[in-house]
Design a protein with these regions (language model features):
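Short, structured "edge-of-domain" segments at secondary-structure transitions
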Residues: 1-167
Length: 167
């Protein structure tokens, strides 16, 4: 069932489709990549009337796009996590609204570690002021309520690390 997306779009060889989004002009989405960069985009700037699409995000070398996340009016914070357990929570207003570009650094990923595949931004989640964030690692998990977020919201814009099993 269904229709191949390549019937509607002409993509270069090796292009990987990561996400599909539906919205109206003023809807907003968090656009980000594994290199740790991202920005907020309005839906009207995400649309192309050309079959070949359009340049939308400049990727750092060796980075890949992550799934676009719809931004709702009640979302106030972004929680970003790397594959090695770094967690950063910050206010959504700290990210710019752009039509295209590289965006701002969401979480620090060293270029050499990204190139080697050792470290990358794995995921981000949008949070409302009454949200709880559940982080699962294997069979273990931790739930962070808003009162717990301050530990992961830096005074200066740098990343913090979750304690590991050995600490």
């Amino acid at each position: 069932m269904g229709e191949p997306i390549t019937g509607r779009l002409s993509a270069d060889s090796g292009v990987k489709f990561v996400s599909a989004s539906v919205g109206v002009d003023d809807d907003r989405f968090l656009i980000m990549n594994t290199g740790g960069y991202g920005y907020i985009a309005e839906y009207k700037n995400m649309i192309s009337n050309k079959k070949s699409g359009r340049a939308f995000m400049r990727l750092p070398e060796n980075a890949e796009m992550l799934k676009a996340i719809p931004v709702r009016k009640n979302h106030t914070h972004i929680a970003a996590v790397s594959n090695i357990g770094k967690l950063l929570i910050f206010e959504i207003d700290e990210l710019p609204i752009l039509g295209k570009g590289k965006g701002n650094k969401i979480i620090n990923i060293p270029k050499d570690k990204l190139a080697a595949g050792e470290e990358f931004m794995a995921h981000a989640q949008l949070l409302a002021t009454d949200s709880s964030l559940r982080i699962e690692v294997g069979k273990r998990f931790v739930t962070l309520k808003p009162k717990d977020w301050s530990e992961y919201i830096p005074v200066s814009y740098t990343h913090l690390t979750l304690p590991t099993k050995n600490e």
